[in-house]
């Protein structure tokens, strides 16, 4: 992939831009040394790399607004960055750009168990949202494979899901509202703390937009009570087609598993070689997980 040519006029103004950024951010939050900006040259898609001109790490919504106003004034491209775990290259900068990382914005701002809502800064990691409410037996449902490290900002940008999206949906199904900063620095709030907020469904546009419409700084998320228990079952098949038909039959039987994972023979062999899990000799596997009370689990297992 050929990277776009940088704007030489912007590069010539680097010192002026850094000076302006230092008026609104502490020194440690402005990274302009080429040896240090190299850390932001890519996300988890490491095949493509390009160090940014500058990286900034604001810690408040107002600081994000101030940064974007400066960049807007100087016509500097801005690339928002969560935790850099994406494999899609969404946080790949250009040589004349400013990377705006939200990693320092990781606080829990409000928790409302009665209404099953939590408000967090967007740099908070996915798994730590559940960690913040687990003592009250709640959890945050979307669970991408990188949930230990990925940021809520990135989850919103990519509309991330995970193994349990079959029952609980992806980020857009669990996002109630955001505070975000438009590219000219204007701060806006969209949605709210309730499932049905008034107005147009702008959240549906924001979620999955890969940061192109603005920088999300706060997110209001739905939290759910933890189920009493969960149990997986592994089913072997002699063909991929039969496994696929079984998925439809499970749903038709009135069972909504919390997760269904499909593995074909090549994947089974690779996983067995690595994990030595004792997978059976077969053409396809389904790993189906159900949850609920012990009675509910047994009933679902019987129907499966």
Question: For each of these PLM feature ranges, what is it?
Answer:
Residues 1-304:
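Noncatalytic alpha-helical scaffold of FAD-dependent oxidoreductases
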């Amino acid at each position: 992939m050929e990277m776009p040519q940088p704007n030489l006029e912007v590069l010539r103004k680097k010192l002026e831009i850094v000076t302006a950024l230092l008026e609104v951010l502490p020194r440690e939050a402005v990274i302009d040394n080429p040896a240090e900006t190299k850390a932001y040259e890519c996300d988890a898609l490491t095949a493509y790399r390009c160090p940014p001109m500058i990286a900034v790490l604001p810690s408040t919504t107002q600081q994000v607004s101030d940064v974007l106003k400066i960049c807007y004034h100087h016509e500097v491209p801005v690339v928002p960055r969560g935790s850099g775990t994406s494999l899609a290259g969404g946080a790949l900068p250009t040589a004349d750009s400013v990377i705006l990382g939200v990693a320092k914005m990781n606080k829990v701002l409000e928790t409302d168990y009665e209404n099953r809502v939590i408000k967090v800064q967007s740099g908070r990691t996915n798994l730590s949202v559940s960690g913040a409410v687990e003592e009250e037996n709640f959890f945050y449902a979307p669970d991408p494979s990188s949930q230990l490290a990925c940021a809520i900002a990135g989850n919103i940008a990519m509309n991330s899901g995970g193994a349990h999206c079959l029952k609980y949906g992806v980020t857009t199904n669990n996002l109630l509202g955001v505070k975000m900063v438009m590219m000219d620095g204007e701060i806006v709030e969209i949605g709210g703390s309730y499932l049905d907020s008034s107005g147009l469904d702008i959240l549906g546009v924001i979620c999955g937009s890969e940061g192109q419409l603005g920088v999300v700084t706060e997110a209001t998320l739905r939290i759910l009570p933890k189920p009493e228990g969960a149990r997986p079952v592994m089913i072997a098949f002699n063909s991929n087609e039969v496994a696929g038909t079984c998925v439809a039959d499970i749903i038709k039987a009135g069972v909504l598993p919390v997760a269904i994972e499909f593995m074909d023979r090549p994947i089974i062999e690779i996983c067995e070689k690595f994990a030595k899990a004792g997978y059976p000799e077969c053409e396809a596997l389904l790993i189906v997980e159900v949850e609920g009370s012990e009675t509910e689990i047994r009933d679902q297992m019987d129907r499966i």
